[in-house]
Every structure is written in C-alpha cells, then in structure tokens.
Amino acid sequence: MSPRPSEHLLHLLHTHQRQRHFISDQAIIDIASQLKLPRAQIEAVTEFYSFFSRKPRGKFDILFSNCTSCGDLTLMQELCDKLSIKACETRCDGQVSLTDISCIGMCDHGASALVNDRPLHSLDSKRITQMAALIEADTPLDAWPAEWFEIDDHVQRTDLLLSTPFEAGSALQILAQESIDATLEKIRYADLRGRGGAGFSTAKKWKFCRESEGETRYVICNADEGEPGTFKDRLLLTRHADSVFEGMVICARIINAKQGYIYLRGEYRYLLDSLETALSARRKAGLLGNAIVGLEGFDFDIAIVLGAGAYICGEESALIESLEEKPGIPRIRPPFPVTSGYLGKPTVVNNVETLAAAAAIVLHGGHWFRGAGTWQSRGSKILSISGDCARPGIYEYPFGVTIHDILNDCGAEHTQAVQVGGPSGRLVDASHFEHRIAFEDLATGGSLMIFDDSRDLLQVIRNFTHFFAHESCGFCTPCRVGTMLLKNGMDKVCSGHATAHDLDELKSTAALVSRRSHCGLGITAPNPIRDGLKNFPQLFEQRLLHQKMEPEFDLDAALEEARQIAQRDDAEAHL
C-alpha cells in the first residue's frame, strides 16, 4: 500500500524540521514507530536530503542560491557580517542560520534566497541591510515587505502552449467522448516526445506501461525541476496547473491507473498550498476522484509529495526511490519504470511540460501540435532564459529556433557562450550560435544560461564541477570520487597552478567518469570540462603554469652525506 501524503516519511520529516528546526533523535524514534520502518532507514533518508538537518538550524533559516547564472554569494557574506555569523553555521542564540544551495528556480529575478522556504529575490546590499535589521528585531516573515515575496512570471514570448487558453475539464470532456485507443493515437500522431531532454516518445511510454502485466499502475509527474537555470515548471505549476493535472488524468485513463503523484521539488514548497487548493477544486467539480466527468469506473486521484533538496531525484528511478521513502539513489535499469516502477508496479513518469502538452493535444488534436517544430521535434519548447541578457524569463518557441535568434530576442550582447540544458548539457561557443533547439541538434530540458564577455568562463566551468561534486549521491565510485577529482582539477586550473600534465589528467578522468558512472549524473558531470576544453582551449592554456613540475630525485647528491661519513670520494662512491 502506498502511504497517504500526510503519512509519508518526507512529509513527517518536513514537519519536524519546520517545527523544531532540526531532526532530533527522538523524532527519528517517533517516526520509525509511527511508520513501522527501521530507524536506520529514517536516519538514512534524513542524512541523504539537504533540507533536513540533524543539528539545529536558525529560527530564520536562510538558503542563498549559488547558481552560476544568478547567484551572488558576496551578498550572503554581507549578511553574515551584519548578523555576526559564519556561512554554513547557526548563530549561537539560534536566531539565524545561513548557507548556500543550488539553483532555487529564481534565475530570472537575479540574486535570490529562500527564507524559511519562502523565496526572496532581486537581492542587493540595501535589501541585505534591511533583512538583517528585521531578523535582529525578530520580525515575523508575514510582517516583512510583501513586495519582497512577489514573483513575476516574466513571460517574454508565448507560442503553442502558453498562448492557447485552457479551461479546467475541457480536455477531459473530449477524452470522455472518444475511445482510449483513439486518445493514444492522438498522442502518437502528434509525435509528442518527453520534454525533460531525453525525448522518448510519450505514446510509446504510455503504451508500454498499458501493456505491462499487473492490475495496479501509477502516474507520476516529475516536478523536481532541479537543473540549474531552469524555472519553466514554476510558471506551469502556478498559471497552467490544470493542464498538467489533466495530462496526468489522460495518462491514467490510457494506462488504467487509479493513483498519481506529483513529486514537487523542495525549493517550490511555497507552491504547495495553491496546488492542493486546485486539486480540491477539481475533486469538487468531478474532474478528479471517483467517476471522473461522469464515467463510471474512471477513478483517479492525485497526491503531492514534497522533495527535500536532492538534485539526483530528478532522475526518474531516483524519484521513485524517494517516493518509496528511501534515499533517492538511481536504480539499475532494466527493468524500466513502465514495467517495474513505484512499488514494483508499472509506472509512467513524465515531466510537467510533457503532461501539459498531452492535455493540449487531446483538446486541439494531433495536427495542431505536429504542425509546429521540425520533423524530428514536433511542437514547441518552453525555455528558461537567464544570465547576461536584458530580458530574462520564459520564452516559448517552435522547435528549430536558433541560439542566435534567441539571443536577439532576449537582448543579449557580446555573448561568448551559452549553456544549453544546464550544467549537464552543452556549453556552446559563438561559432555555433546557428545551431537549433531540437532533439536532433541541441536537446534541452529548458535551461539556457547566457554568459557575456565579462564572465570568466573557467570560473563558470569550475562552479559547475562543484555543483556535480556536491550533488553526487555517492552510490558509485566513478561518480563519487571522479566528480571530486574533476572539482579539484578545475580548482587547480583556476588558481593558476595547473600544468599541461594536469590537463591530460583532467581529460582522462572526465572520460572515465562519463564511461563508468551508474547514472546520468555521473555520465554528464564531465560535460562542462569537455566542452570547455573543446570550444575554449585558449582559456585553459592561458592559465597553465609553464614550467617543469615533474618530481625529480638526484640520487648521487643524496649519497653525499654517506660519502662524508665513509670518508670516500672515489669513482665507485658516485653514481
């Protein structure tokens, strides 16, 4: 049996963390007793996820984004100085704690942070000073300036999905009027491919799951948008949630699932209440629960489980492990989730954008969708654009748009590189800006980070290697050790202490990590270094230490002391 969200291990840990500011030994004992799980399992889960702490955090728990695109840790240091606290520590009076974390999905708003799970953005020195005063005065967050917490969608360009109105229940009314096979054929004809970056056929995935043995099946929405520089799901879950929900219901109808889950990233906790309210409204309207849209036997419901700050849980099998109340360590595949997923049952895992697109296809038809894009990449792609540009935000384009056109639209100037698909993607130099966003060219889950000529690209690459070393789940040695070696290697390059030999070592380590790692994190972790060496070799050469650094040992000189003791200096006493 799957646990109710209120009884899920992650939910209980979140509750204790918020109430007590840490997970105590007694909390672990109580939770283990309540869930009838081994204490060791509770401890393992607590230690795996960065949002849980075994040591007390502050009443004001502040997490600064260190994202390469928008992070500004000098502001965190300013706040540390004003509050008389060291980074990554809790002040002795328990009032405040500060640390840095990976991207929180606010890259279009500049420097940002989470304060007790609520996002603050557009941070500058003035606001840091104001924050420090409010914290010292013990002012509740609800009494802080409301505009600090207001989030602009920053929708800069719309196309197929975002420009088409979607009314709750509209796709389900059509679903009720056609056969299951006809609905699946719509998805197949539209040639919808997964929007997470891998691009697997959505219709095939649903068909494989539908044909798998077993009566119980599950639908999971992967809303763990953890790739640095990505924030499109934030928009979809706030302004277009009904299309996402209906995509899940449509999938459930096709594969005959009764239960679905939204795995929401911990950094988006502030969206939880609005999503729960929307789900309740759908139940009241007959769009969720029993006999959906009046169809007897069409029963399906959705629950939300909140993640806890583990990037690896964006990988579908790690996400499933997390849903099963375990550390989010990727599984060995095969079997794939469509045959053995959540609780060992056939499971479909799709990301937010894929499900929203599926609902739109059922509503408007396959012709409407496949008319946009390229022959291998149908439809549109929603992009999160950030970094050095005048107009960061959400841009939706038909597949096939060039990097050059995107840079023009967002007001980017003097661009030296674009990171497509987050740190695990491609670092593209100016000579390749005519390449296109498409599965057959530049595939991306939705992140584009722009770097102009004022940026030190080696520091950008270094930050990416630090990100992967921090986010490795530690399961396999090539990734656990290899990402640390890559991090140390880039530290050496950026400090000006690396030699040509060190670069050779960096290349061979990158190849080994990519070839031998257990999951996609390790496989793609070397990408920033490899792309950097390929596209910007001169930057590495300029930082090299051009002197002989090989270890040497003069054996004859080492024997000098022995010769003096023996009072010998003849030819046989020398080498």
Where are each of the predicted segments found?
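Feature of Fe-S/electron-transfer and energy-metabolism proteins
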Residues: 1-575
